Amino acid sequence: MAVGKNKRLSKGKKGLKKKIIDPFTRKDWFDIKAPSTFENRNVGKTLINRSTGMKNAADGLKGRIVEVNLADLQGSEDHSYRNVKLRVDEVQGKNLLTNFHGLSFTSDKLRSLVRKWQSLVEANVTVKTADDYVLRVFALAFTKRQANQVKKTTYAQSSKLREVRKKMSEIMQREVSAVTLAQLTSKLIPEVIGREIEKSTQTIFPLQNVHIRKVKVLKQPKFDLGALLALHGESGGEEKGRKVNTGFKDVVLESV
């Protein structure tokens, strides 16, 4: 049997292990700040390779999209079924100033809404806000039993569904086009548009579980640093945002 070289045997210094360098020593951490529309502005942290030579770290950070659960931004589990996308638009020191970039429902929430014996109504519109953001807004609703109804099912006729869908599109077009993106975010959090749709369609067919399930930013205007700083309260250092007005007043009961 021919005897060959044993490649597993180390040959002097060649067998020594190379020095392992931790890649995180060449990276910097940055704090992600949400707009003041939300209660909790500290979203989290992200990292990137440190600036070297002609390569600036800020260029790699701008445009990053982060997805956060709305419950974390509002500090309430009542909003846990919605996720918000934020886009990094500006770097200030170690703070990343973000802007609203989209909203979506979680898949488990959508599945929990679909039930038998009812009709699903969906509508979507492409609309421009007052500050020239082009958005595509998706809404969904479900039919519900009418007052004193005996029949188990709540299926609606096609003609009724078309009327409801047209009304939903009109309301979304009107509500979104009249406000800025920041004002629209304040409407989306307490679901003002969904309640308006539910109220306006009562004469056509009663609805339930009316939601704006998704918002996509298709086009954004030219970047305005002043508007972004105003959205963040002139500086990215504040940790708390302003409280969103839900449009309802607390009812005070008289003592008996």
From Swiss-Prot:
UniProt-listed InterPro entries: Ribosomal_eS1, Ribosomal_eS1_euk
Subunit structure of this chain's protein: Component of the small ribosomal subunit. Mature ribosomes consist of a small (40S) and a large (60S) subunit. The 40S subunit contains about 33 different proteins and 1 molecule of RNA (18S). The 60S subunit contains about 49 different proteins and 3 molecules of RNA (25S, 5.8S and 5S).
Ranges annotated as spanning the membrane: none
Record protein name field: Small ribosomal subunit protein eS1A
Modified residues (N-acetylalanine): 2
GO BP terms: translation
Family: Belongs to the eukaryotic ribosomal protein eS1 family.
Chief localization: cytoplasm
Subcellular location: Cytoplasm
Pfam families: Ribosomal_S3Ae
CC per GO annotation: cytosolic small ribosomal subunit
Key words of the record: Acetylation, Cytoplasm, Ribonucleoprotein, Ribosomal protein
Sample GO molecular function, one term: structural constituent of ribosome
HAMAP family: Ribosomal_eS1_euk
